[in-house]
Amino acid sequence: MQRFYVVKEVLSDKLKRVYEFTVGNEYLEQQVDDRLREIAANVRMDGFRKGKVSLDLVRRNCGEDVVREVLSKVVDDASSQFMQEGGFGDVVTSEVRITSHPKVCSTEGKGGDLVYELQFELMPEVPSINPEEIALKEMEAEIGQEDVDKFIGELKTRYPNFVASDSPKQRAAAGDKVVIDYNSSFKGKALRGGSAKGFVAVLGGGHLPKEFEDKITGMKVGDVKEFKLGFPSDYRVRLFAGKEVEMSVKLVSIMVPKDVGDHEELAKSCGFGCAEDMVNFATESLKGRFAFMSDALMRKELFDHMETIYQGQVPESVVSQESARIRRELAPSELEAMGEDGILKEAERRVRLGMLLMKVSQDNNIAVEARDISAFVQSNYLNYGASLESVLKLLRSNQGVRDHIRGKVLEDKVVRYMVAKAKKERQNVPAGDLKSLFESI
């Protein structure tokens, strides 16, 4: 295809490219005239038969729209032809900036060429990886009686046994289970749904606002306390969010935690049929917990190996996006500890890994299917701080969310494929050592 434009290189820096295109006014006028004739041959206007509208009338009525249409098409055609002939391969981002607008089909006369810049960033070539040539350590935890006992101790803490206090002088303290009756009002008016009888909560368990718990702490059975309580604007219960509410609280009963020394008694309090069932549950839970840790360590070892394979250039625009994502994900204290250089290095590392994983997916025809997306959302929607229905709605309506989740799913699918194909060196390690290794990641 013959070129209708002149192009010159403005910038070639690493992966960045900038080219200046010039399209002559004569060519543009011809394209506009051809389009106007095409419209005139088919347009219907009052007082004219089809195809009998004068070109000047069409020019007056449609000229500006046709010029915009032609300029857009010329830019697209010139850029596409140049990119195809140049063999640039995959492009990460591209941007067009018109630097000189021509006078075409204008009442102010004709003249001037179309001049615009095409800026883009290349996707670098990354090497292929054969997962079968990678060796990974597959650690299996040696679970001992000490580990099982520790897990059962966690059950004691998680499911404490409470008994009613028989002392009239007993005051509510952190760790106690209390039963309260309460009423709430706002500006002297009772809040609908803002009262309850027999409400049960464990002090210090995070079920109540801390200020509320502080007011209850120290009360005795039968005590009534009235106080004002302020709720933050983002409080999960809309009824109270952003309000200072008058509260009246009566402490009905106090139950204190009682240590359960006998395994049979603990098993029954936790809902197991017998102590043996509880021990079996503890053992299987530990196996699952340590299998997760082992898998995470293998993934880290895989990523560390992949980092050595490609240390080449990465697209700055993608690194910039990843840096912004890191800043959104991490707490201010973590960002301060990393520093700007640390954030940049981590962003570059993530982008390189992403490029390599994408290459593996292309080489091995690994694709994301609808059922993969569905399974991911079902398992991870709580991580987005929303209900399943809300995340699904966001997935349907937000392209950015769709791309993010699709990327996470593809990464997980490719990593699982690579781990499955890699050679494994099985190692038995004490459970405590495996836990320490996992916590050091």
From Swiss-Prot:
Give the NCBIfam families listed for this entry: tig (TIGR00115)
Similarity remark: Belongs to the FKBP-type PPIase family. Tig subfamily.
Q: What is its EC number?
A: 5.2.1.8
Principal localization? cytoplasm
**Record's InterPro entries?**
PPIase_dom_sf, PPIase_FKBP_dom, Trig_fac, Trigger_fac_C, Trigger_fac_C_sf, Trigger_fac_ribosome-bd_bac, Trigger_fac_ribosome-bd_sf, Trigger_fact/SurA_dom_sf
Q: What is known of its domains?
A: Consists of 3 domains; the N-terminus binds the ribosome, the middle domain has PPIase activity, while the C-terminus has intrinsic chaperone activity on its own.
Q: Which UniProt keywords apply?
A: Cell cycle, Cell division, Chaperone, Cytoplasm, Isomerase, Rotamase
| Organism, as annotated | Anaplasma marginale (strain St. Maries)
The answer on whether this UniProt entry bears the keyword Cytoplasm reads yes
* Name of this chain's protein: Trigger factor
Q: Name one GO cellular component term.
A: cytoplasm
Give the location in the cell. Answer: Cytoplasm
